[in-house]
């Protein structure tokens, strides 16, 4: 039997000797960086919108299995550690605990993908919704400069050895009208106006592209200022309720 006793909590009566398998539906029609989205063109989710938290098991390792729809040619991008995946990225993933599981969003679809290294660290950039005239090489080169500058700002002496991640992923959703970002431990989810992307033969940076680079810089800086250096209230998240702090003036203001 399953019964709900809180807005975010359910109790299940089950036998200890038997495996428990749950099937449930989730809302996936929020085309932002916050929750989840799924249609015939693209899929995206934060673990907090899909993955239930088992009380008392938050510190245990968590596995995630991702299966492609029959006939799909989608690919997968995420910062979560893969265990056994195919060329498209579908398969098995592993998180060391629940916090890591829900702090690694997934992007799925026929997106544009590019790679670069910053201070010797692999970085990946994927974009859903990019137009044909998009200049990927320009975006990668400019983003690389941003990343190297910020890594050296935080780790001047040993940037490669001291960076808080071994690989980083940018996930950008280019839409008709939108703007925003959400930082994660080794990735960031971004949304921008499609017209803000750099185009081939663009001689001068457009105002929109400058705004996009500012967003990229801001969210990447949060890798340290929020994800590493953070309020005491965020040391251990309480997923049953809102988590408040009076220090956003610093964590958002200083980052900007």
What are these regions (language model features)?
Residues 115-247:
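Juxtacatalytic substrate-recognition/specificity segment
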Residues 79-87:
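Short, solvent-exposed aromatic-acidic interface loops
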Residues 26-62:
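Glycine/proline-rich low-complexity spacer/linker segments in large multi-domain proteins
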Residues 26-28, 68-70, 80, 129, ...:
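A mature extracytoplasmic/lumenal domain signature
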Residues 244-256:
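Metalloprotease/metallohydrolase-associated module, dominated by Zn2+-dependent proteases
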Residues 1, 18, 49-51, 59-77, ...:
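Zn2+-dependent metallopeptidase catalytic core
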Residues 13-25, 86-110:
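C-terminal beta-strand-rich structural cap/linker in extracellular carbohydrate-active enzymes
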Residues 1-38:
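A surface-exposed beta-strand-loop module
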């Amino acid at each position: 039997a399953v019964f709900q006793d809180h807005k975010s909590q359910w109790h299940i009566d089950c036998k200890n000797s038997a495996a428990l398998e749950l099937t449930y539906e989730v809302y996936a029609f929020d085309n932002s960086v916050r929750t989840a989205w799924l249609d015939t063109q693209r899929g995206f989710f934060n673990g907090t919108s899909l993955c239930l938290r088992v009380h008392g098991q938050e510190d245990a390792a968590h596995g995630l299995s991702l299966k492609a729809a029959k006939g799909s040619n989608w690919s997968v991008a995420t910062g979560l550690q893969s265990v056994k995946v195919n060329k498209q990225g579908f398969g098995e993933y592993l998180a060391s605990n629940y916090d890591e599981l829900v702090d690694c969003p997934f992007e799925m679809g026929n997106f544009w993908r590019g790679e670069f290294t910053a201070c010797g660290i692999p970085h990946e950039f994927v974009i859903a919704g990019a137009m044909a005239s998009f200049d990927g090489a320009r975006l990668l080169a400019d983003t690389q400069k941003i990343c190297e500058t910020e890594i050296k700002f935080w780790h001047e002496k040993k940037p490669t050895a001291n960076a808080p991640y071994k690989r980083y992923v940018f996930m950008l959703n280019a839409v008709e009208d939108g703007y925003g970002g959400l930082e994660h431990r080794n990735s960031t989810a971004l949304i921008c106006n499609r017209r803000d992307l750099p185009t081939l033969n663009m001689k001068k940076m457009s105002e929109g592209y400058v705004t996009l680079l500012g967003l990229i810089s801001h969210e990447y800086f949060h890798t340290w200022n929020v994800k590493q250096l953070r309020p005491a209230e965020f040391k251990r998240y309480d997923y049953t309720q809102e988590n408040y702090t009076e220090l956003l003036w610093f964590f958002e203001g200083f980052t900007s």
